[in-house]
Each structure stands twice: as structure tokens, then as C-alpha cells.
Regions:
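Hydrophobic core of transmembrane alpha-helices in multi-pass small-molecule transporters
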Residues: 26, 103, 114-129
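Central cavity-lining transmembrane alpha-helices of secondary-active solute carriers
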Residues: 62-83, 130, 164, 290-303
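Short amphipathic helix-loop junctions that connect adjacent transmembrane helices
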Residues: 37-60, 262-286
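Glycine-rich segments within core transmembrane alpha-helices of 12-TM secondary carriers
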Residues: 72, 147-175, 181-193, 289-293
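Intracellular loop-helix junctions on the cytosolic face of multi-pass helical membrane proteins
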Residues: 1-20, 143-144, 171-281, 299-303
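C-terminal ends and interior cores of transmembrane alpha-helices
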Residues: 95-116
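Intracellular juxtamembrane helix-capping segments at the cytosolic ends
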Residues: 128-142
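Cytoplasmic membrane-interface "Motif A"-like loop-to-helix N-cap segments
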Residues: 85-97, 144
Length: 306
């Protein structure tokens, strides 16, 4: 059996593999939020300005942003299924990282076909990367481990740090050198995350490998199990829990609808506001995007090393 240094070695009481995934996810979120902070502003910036954009209307830019975000949330479902059935988590993560790197670099070019190609690659790559790196985090801990929750809290801080740095640095570069330099920087850090994970992934041993054919259940056995589950009615406790899940899911719709305004309408509002000029602050308005990320970092930091 392969040794599993990712689990056997610990740092701050947690498997060392957690911190490998922490940095891989941090650089991926750097690239994602860095690009996301620029997207709508690039779309609405006038073609004839000093830092020319595409000259879209705010409505069209918001529509594209909404479609992009919707697909970014949908594709992880498909990416998770493909990883479970075919690729395994590690190959799915590497595949997603490659696609997203290519997507960011495609955005760094001016022709419109490259722009749409870049968005498509980012959507597909995110579907492979995002759900599967989180799944590996869960497999670093035995079932019922009290450390798993705090492990995910540490992992989530990588998301916050990456988003914080990405929105600031990509925004600064886009404002002072040009939009495509900002998109290119996002690609550079995505490549860093990809290389880091690829070179160190063997430390995870058997975790995240493609499923073996012998371990896959026969189709008839699966169908029989499904039929057996169907015949069993939900208990009272299960029904109550499903109701709670439904209520939370309903209200989460409004939360995410408001949250996603940070990358669209709030960005445009901040860009058009005269407040910045009155203070003589000619800085990348896209860096305003990091405020909610900064707040979330402290909101989730209380249980880091429990």
C-alpha cells in the first residue's frame, strides 16, 4: 500500500495535506476573484477611453455576468460526477486547473472569439476543480473526526486570502497597465496553483485516485438498492430535516443573489460614483470588491485551530 504522508504528518494538529490544498485553492481563488472583479468593468468601459474596454451597456454586461456565474455554479455538479465515476479527484483537479489557466490567458488577448473561449474554459475548468479539491479535504480525516470542521475552516481561509489578494492585485494591474494584464496575472497564479498541486499530489497516496472497476457496483445491484430505498418511507426526523434544508435553500437564493452584486452592479456603482474623485483617489475601483471578502475572513476565523 502507498504511504500517505498527507495524513500521517501533521501541522498545527491537522494533516499536512490540508495545507497543500490550502495553497492550491488559495491561488485558484486568487485567479477566479481577480478575474471576476474585472469582468463587468471591462465590459462596460468605453472603447475610446485611455484603458479601452468593450463598450457594453450595464444591462448587457450584467446579463453576461449572470449567465457566467450561473454556469460556474452548475458545472461542479457535472465535474463531481465525472470525478467520482471516471477521472478521480486528482486528475479532475489537474484537468480543471489546466483549463482555467488557458481560460485566463485567453482573456488576456483582444479578439472577441478568445474572450468567449476564455469564459467557456473557465466555466468548464471550475466544474472539474472546485468540488473535487474540497472532497479531498474531507478524505484527510477519519469519519466522525472532531477536527474535520476546523479543517474546513482553515481551508476556507485560503479562499478568503486568495480572493482578497486577487481582487486587489489584478485590479491594480488592470487599472495601471491595462485590462488584459489583469486577466493575465490571474492566469499566472492559476498556473502556480496547478504546478504546486501536480508536483506534490503523490503525497496523498490512494486518496483521489480514479475508481477501480472492481470496486464499482454492478448496475443491477445499484437498481436493487434504489428500489429498496424507495420502499422505505421517511421517518419523522428525516422529514423535519428535509423541511429545514428546503427553508435554508430558499433563503440562500436571496443571499447569493445579493452576494453576486459585488461583482456586477456594485462594481459599476463604485466605478461611476463621484465620491472617489472628490477624495482624489484615482485607484482601481475593482479593488472595492475585496471589502466583503475581508469581512468574511474575520467572520470565519474564530474556529481555525479548534
Amino acid at each position: 500500500m502507498e504511504s500517505n504522508d498527507a495524513i500521517n504528518k501533521e501541522v498545527f494538529g491537522h494533516p499536512v495535506g490540508l495545507f497543500v490544498l490550502f495553497f492550491a485553492e488559495m491561488w485558484e481563488r486568487f485567479s477566479y476573484y481577480g478575474m471576476r472583479a474585472l469582468l463587468v468593468l471591462y465590459l462596460v468601459e468605453e472603447i475610446g477611453s485611455e484603458n479601452p474596454g468593450l463598450g457594453w451597456s450595464a444591462e448587457d454586461a450584467g446579463s453576461l455576468y449572470g449567465s457566467y456565474t450561473m454556469l460556474v455554479y452548475i458545472t461542479p455538479i457535472l465535474g463531481g460526477i465525472i470525478a467520482d465515476k471516471v477521472l478521480g479527484y486528482r486528475k479532475a483537479i489537474t484537468t480543471g486547473a489546466i483549463l482555467m489557466s488557458l481560460g485566463h490567458f485567453a482573456l488576456a488577448f483582444n479578439p472577441m472569439p478568445a474572450f468567449y473561449l476564455g469564459l467557456g474554459l473557465l466555466i468548464i475548468g471550475n466544474g472539474f476543480f472546485k468540488p473535487n479539491i474540497s472532497s479531498i479535504v474531507g478524505q484527510l480525516y477519519p469519519d466522525g473526526s472532531p477536527k474535520k470542521d476546523s479543517g474546513y475552516t482553515i481551508f476556507y481561509q485560503g479562499i478568503n486570502v486568495g480572493a482578497f489578494l486577487g481582487s486587489i492585485l489584478c485590479g491594480y494591474l488592470a487599472e495601471n497597465m491595462g485590462w488584459h494584464y489583469g486577466f493575465g496575472l490571474a492566469g499566472v497564479f492559476m498556473v502556480i496553483g496547478m504546478i504546486q498541486f501536480y508536483l506534490i499530489q503523490n503525497m496523498f497516496g490512494n486518496i483521489g485516485l480514479p475508481p477501480k472497476k472492481g470496486n464499482l457496483p454492478e448496475t443491477n445491484d445499484v437498481l436493487d438498492s434504489i428500489e429498496e430505498v424507495k420502499k422505505q418511507p421517511l421517518t419523522k426526523v428525516e422529514s423535519q430535516r428535509l423541511i429545514v434544508v428546503g427553508v435554508l435553500a430558499f433563503f440562500s437564493i436571496f443571499f447569493w443573489a445579493a452576494f453576486e452584486q459585488a461583482g456586477s452592479s456594485l462594481n459599476i456603482f463604485a466605478s461611476d460614483s463621484k465620491f472617489w474623485d472628490s477624495l482624489s483617489l484615482k485607484q482601481a475601483i475593482s479593488t472595492f470588491f475585496f471589502v466583503n471578502i475581508f469581512f468574511r475572513f474575520f467572520l470565519n476565523s474564530s474556529s481555525l485551530f479548534e
